[in-house]
Amino acid sequence: MLFLIFLSLTHVNADELFNKGKEVFLGAGNCVACHMLSDAGSNAMVGPNLNEIRPDIQRTLMAVKNGIGVMPAMEGILTDEEIEAVAHYTSIAAEQ
């Protein structure tokens, strides 16, 4: 029984993280301005098409924190929680 409760809570937390990541992608992170991602309704072509490259969480964390190419580093602009959320969101949304 406790295992089922844990699974339920984990699913809720994952959903919350996904939703928070989408908020960051569309809002504070302004990722939507440069990156194509179908789930976000973004058709931008400045940065990589996330639907095609399907970045994993670690790759996204590094790029968002440190910047890459013309993409600026967002560490210090976004909170660690926002960076984690947007990395979680993009890795899952790009797989859909």
What residue spans do the PLM features occupy?
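Bacterial N-terminal signal peptides
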Residues: M1-S8
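Electrostatic cytochrome c docking/interface patches
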Residues: S8-L26, R59
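Inter-heme linker and motif-flanking segments adjacent to c-type heme-binding CXXCH motifs
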Residues: E16, G41, I92-Q96
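Gly/Gly-Pro-rich "capping" loops immediately C-terminal to redox-active cysteine motifs
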Residues: K22-E23, V32-I68
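C-type cytochrome heme c attachment motif
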Residues: L26-M36, G69-P72, E84-H88
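C-terminal capping alpha-helices of c-type cytochrome domains
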Residues: G76-Q96
